[in-house]
């Protein structure tokens, strides 16, 4: 009888005070599906969610319960294995899972690598979602926010629209070396005079194509461009010719991953602001390239 009275009293409190009901739910732990997490993401980006987008599920069942979330730059096979070992069954990746922008798999029908990756995702009940277009489109751009934070260059940012920084004066070689150390990069490549003193730097992340890179380099207030990757026969040759003409220009290529991965580290922190009671962790993909000079 006493237990029944207590239950009725508690029910009455919840009816009178909806906030108490919310608190009780939070205290007992919220179960969410991957689809529900994505709906929260859609509600928290500042841009309108587009119907034509690569930001879709790439594997697994969106209606499965999320035990934990792993954010990553690339859902590599090793990243998937690490996520599984940590109990993080929902992987949010920035780049494709199946080696092409749209994650099309028809052309890989008999490919053993793709088949094994698909099988691993299925057998381990993992869910993979790509978060690319809207992470770039939200304001501020999530990848850029993470990169500026990792670089520690917020105080040097002079033009946020064109990502131009006024840095303490240093040589191109010293700047390239500092970037290599900052990102533990194994394959930084440079075009230009290593001894040239520079202060005005621009940042163009990822692989946007040559024209955004060249348009940045043609500015009078840009001496050195820090970029992810490029077509060597376009931006690289543009800078080589500019240097041959006596223009104060240089290009530092740090690799696509190194130019964007910090943004997915930041994504994990961003998600924690509105996804509660679910473990969220960033897993690095790691630089896939290596330099024979570094092999001992």
Task: Describe every region a protein language model picked out.
Residues 6, 12, 17-296:
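Hydrophobic structural segments
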